[in-house]
Amino acid sequence: MAATAATTTSSHLLLSSSRHVASSSQPSILSPRSLFSNNGKRAPTGVRNHQYASGVRCMAVAADAAETKTAARKKSGYELQTLTGWLLRQEMKGEIDAELTIVMSSISLACKQIASLVQRAGISNLTGVQGAVNIQGEDQKKLDVISNEVFSNCLRSSGRTGIIASEEEDVPVAVEESYSGNYVVVFDPLDGSSNIDAAVSTGSIFGIYSPNDECIVDDSDDISALGSEEQRCIVNVCQPGNNLLAAGYCMYSSSVIFVLTLGKGVFSFTLDPMYGEFVLTQENIEIPKAGRIYSFNEGNYQMWDDKLKKYIDDLKDPGPTGKPYSARYIGSLVGDFHRTLLYGGIYGYPRDAKSKNGKLRLLYECAPMSFIVEQAGGKGSDGHSRVLDIQPTEIHQRVPLYIGSTEEVEKLEKYLA
């Protein structure tokens, strides 16, 4: 009985709507004629005919409500944004081109391979020294050599890299012509490798530039025999940090963290071991304006100049607050910088009596890290000037580095002035 009544009522409503539409001087909104005015011109887009039947109005309102509900759908807790997907979105927005997307993907692949090697170093007998010395005069660890090969091979196979410059190479290396591309990539394949044997945090650092000129140096060339053209090529590879298109680092620790900037904010991705993909975990990272943490190797204190000693002594003084700065030092630039980026404070590797120009390399350590910290709202300085403004004169040029929260770096600069 109730079903019959419902059917009758429904039929009655439909019949009433039909009669209303038929008697109206205006066409129904469901009719194609409703898209045009009386003189045959098309009505403006988005304008509705409000003189339609009440039954049609109910249908439209229901449709609008359904659309709103769909738009307000909550993001699934299982929805992951991978580094590859994120890069493709940046490409679609015009932030980067397809070439740079491929280069970045190649770098992320190299980082995954190195992460695996680091995690299995003790098992695979990859600890200890290689028995060779690099251009810096440093004993090469086994993983230094292997990581450099991994990075170089991934960049060569991308087909989008023209020149690569590494901490472990004497000179910039031109990628074979059949595989060469447009980008210059500088990198430290394994920063903090002295920590490998103790399973302490290490990392890889990279920066990407557009080329100023074509490099013709081959990896078989003897640097002492280079002519004027080759030397000019090296100078052209040495670009200031202001020219960086992208920079980042990958930290190999309790988790594998890939931090990246394309010049518009800093983003962090964590390697998911289940899927083997870097997953977006932090967006638009901002370093605190100040932080009561300093990260210096105080073993070199006696070799520092008096101004820097005074600065460090004052940090240790409790002062009116009764709370001195906390000292934190890992011995890995990537590890110490990552903590500073998240918690605030200052990291420093100054010049001293032994290292007149400091120890860190400008092109592939100081400049990329300074680019990242500035994108996060911090500051990178050599104690007197902005790191990104320094024009390198050689591939392995060293400079002092003070990097971190803006207020902390500016405070140090006043001491050193």
Curated annotation (Swiss-Prot):
Residues that bind substrate, according to the entry?
A: 191-194, 297, 329, 347, 349, 359
Keyword set, alphabetical order: Acetylation, Calvin cycle, Carbohydrate metabolism, Chloroplast, Disulfide bond, Hydrolase, Magnesium, Metal-binding, Plastid, Transit peptide
Record's GO cellular component terms: apoplast; chloroplast; chloroplast stroma; cytosol; stromule
**HAMAP family attached to this UniProt entry:** FBPase_class1
Cysteines paired by S-S bonds: 233-238
- Tell me, how does this one assemble? Homotetramer.
Instruction: Give cofactor(s), names only.
Output: Mg(2+)
**Where located?**
Plastid, Chloroplast stroma
Residues recorded with modification N-acetylalanine: 60
Q: What class of enzyme is it?
A: hydrolase
Anything else of interest in the record?
A: In plants there are two FBPase isozymes: one in the cytosol and the other in the chloroplast.
Q: Which reaction does it catalyse?
A: beta-D-fructose 1,6-bisphosphate + H2O = beta-D-fructose 6-phosphate + phosphate
Q: What is its main location?
A: plastid
> Which amino acid positions bind Mg(2+) 3, per UniProt?
188, 191, 365
Q: Where is this region: Disordered?
A: 24-48
| Residues the entry annotates as binding Mg(2+) 2 | 167, 188, 190
Summarizing the function annotation, the protein's role is:
Catalyzes the irreversible reaction from fructose-1,6-bisphosphate to fructose-6-phosphate and inorganic phosphate, to regenerate the primary CO(2) acceptor molecule, ribulose-1,5-bisphosphate. Involved in the regulation of photosynthetic electron flow and sucrose synthesis. Its activity is critical for normal plant development and important for the regulation of a wide range of metabolic processes.
Which molecular-function annotation in GO is an example for this chain?
fructose 1,6-bisphosphate 1-phosphatase activity
Annotated pathway, please?
Answer: Carbohydrate biosynthesis; Calvin cycle
Q: Tell me the organism.
A: Arabidopsis thaliana
Task: Write down what this protein is called.
Answer: Fructose-1,6-bisphosphatase 1, chloroplastic
